[in-house]
């Protein structure tokens, strides 16, 4: 089932590299507009939010649409790793607010080591 939005976390990725990838994968990006600590743009018709250093060295990328080229976070994370060559983390499936805290700490890491399930405490 297609997720209503896509969110991945990228380690040490530059905003410009992400912009270039989004332009290629989704569509031309409008100029980034900074609002507080976040940056927003449109990639094609998709609203995008970039939060630098959302969790330590990890940047958050949110595509706020179900009309992305990817079915879910994992598919997007795989494409991002292939294009950018930096470690990517994402939730293993759609995340629900009412999930147990232990489940909320389960993540998928995609890197040069391959794909693995990890425990990542983000608080």
Locations of regions flagged by a protein language model:
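Short, extreme N-terminal segment that most often corresponds to the first beta-strand
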Residues: 1-23
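A general secondary-structure signal for short beta-strands and their flanking turns/coil
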Residues: 3-5, 56-58, 81
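Short, hydrophobic/π-rich interface segment
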Residues: 67-90
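Acidic, proline/glycine-rich low-complexity IDRs
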Residues: 83-123
């Amino acid at each position: 089932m297609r997720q209503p939005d896509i969110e991945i976390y990228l380690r040490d990725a530059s905003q410009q590299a992400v912009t270039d990838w989004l332009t290629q994968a989704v569509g031309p990006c409008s100029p980034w507009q900074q609002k507080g600590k976040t940056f927003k743009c449109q990639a094609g018709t998709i609203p995008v939010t970039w939060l630098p250093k959302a969790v330590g060295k990890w940047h958050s990328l949110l595509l706020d649409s179900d009309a992305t080229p990817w079915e879910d976070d994992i598919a997007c994370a795989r494409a991002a790793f292939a294009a950018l060559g930096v470690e990517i983390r994402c939730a293993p499936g759609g995340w629900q607010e009412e999930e147990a805290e232990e489940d909320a700490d389960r993540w998928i890491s995609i890197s040069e080591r391959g794909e693995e399930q990890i425990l990542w405490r983000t608080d």
